[in-house]
């Protein structure tokens, strides 16, 4: 006997679909506006979604190409956007790799080893992670100012110092990977030990291949967080050529003149490395899930 949908059920389905469309519009519309502003003539934040006279002026300036005006004058790129983009990718890439390495080894120790004070350390790490980095800006500046006197490449206005500062925020990632490790059956490592594998070999050859999905997630989250981070980077970096893109983009928005078009083009460029890394990591994520299912 065929089931007949009541009107109330249909209305709920329609309401759900309408809510989803509204939610998508709230997400997509601002992104489309940013793209539209980057193709408008002039530096105006308001205007139609589809520019009447599309222009590549802002994109050329963002890519480091001088623009020739109608009167014959030449407008040089105001800021080294591509240098900022490279700085962001370099800092985010190195930081993410180091965070994954440190978080993985630390999580393995907390998940598989027994030592005094383990629970206390875990809880303390989580409590300290709850405090925002903004509260420690003064301390960070004083710390890296002093550190730079002994280790110059870890001092102020260095990417090494910035990367080192980001490594202090791995507590959440340690907890995440630790939880994943605890879902993996210990019998796999015990079987490897019976075959003569050392704890390091069992960790590297058994546990890590099964943990590719969570490692990919941690890498993505770390990369996104570093690319978009502003307070610490703006504190430690003072040279314009050493800025990351998130910090450098603020140079377009000064009280005398808001360069919205140039800012929008730089904003779209800042999304490219995140998108590329996510797509690449997504491939590894799916591969890791499949491999883990077969080996398990």
UniProtKB/Swiss-Prot annotation:
The chain crosses the membrane at residues 13-35, 89-111, 124-143, 153-175, 205-227, 258-280. GO terms for molecular function: ABC-type maltose transporter activity. It is a multi-pass membrane protein. Its main location: membrane. It is found in: Cell inner membrane. Part of the ABC transporter complex MalEFGK involved in maltose/maltodextrin import. Probably responsible for the translocation of the substrate across the membrane. This is Maltose/maltodextrin transport system permease protein MalG. It comes from Vibrio cholerae serotype O1 (strain ATCC 39315 / El Tor Inaba N16961).
């Amino acid at each position: 006997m065929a089931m007949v949908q009541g009107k109330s059920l249909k209305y709920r389905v329609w309401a759900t679909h309408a809510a989803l469309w509204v939610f998508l519009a709230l997400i997509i519309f601002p992104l489309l506006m940013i793209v539209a502003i980057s193709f408008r003539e002039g530096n105006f934040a308001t205007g139609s979604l589809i520019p009447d006279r599309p222009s590549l002026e802002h994109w050329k300036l963002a890519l480091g190409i001088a623009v020739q005006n109608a009167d014959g004058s030449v407008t040089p790129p105001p800021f080294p956007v591509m240098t900022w983009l490279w700085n962001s990718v370099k800092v985010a890439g190195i930081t993410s790799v180091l965070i994954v390495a440190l978080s993985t080894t630390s999580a393995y120790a907390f998940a598989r080893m027994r030592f005094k004070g383990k629970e206390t350390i875990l809880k303390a790490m989580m409590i300290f992670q709850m405090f925002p980095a903004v509260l420690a800006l003064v301390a960070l500046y004083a710390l890296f100012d002093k550190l730079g006197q002994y280790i110059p490449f870890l001092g102020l206005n260095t990417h090494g110092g910035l990367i080192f500062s980001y490594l202090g925020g791995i507590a959440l990632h340690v907890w995440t990977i630790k939880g994943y490790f605890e879902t993996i059956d210990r019998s796999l490592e015990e079987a490897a030990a019976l075959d003569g594998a050392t704890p390091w070999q069992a960790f590297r050859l058994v546990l890590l291949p099964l943990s590719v999905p969570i490692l990919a997630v941690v890498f993505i989250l770390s990369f996104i967080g570093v690319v978009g981070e502003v307070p610490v980077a703006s504190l430690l970096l003072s040279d314009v050529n050493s800025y990351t893109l998130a910090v450098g983009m603020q140079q377009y928005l000064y009280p005398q003149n808001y360069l919205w078009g140039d800012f929008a083009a730089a904003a779209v460029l800042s999304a490219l490395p995140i998108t590329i890394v996510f797509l690449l990591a997504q491939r590894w994520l799916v591969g890791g899930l499949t491999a883990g299912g077969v080996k398990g």
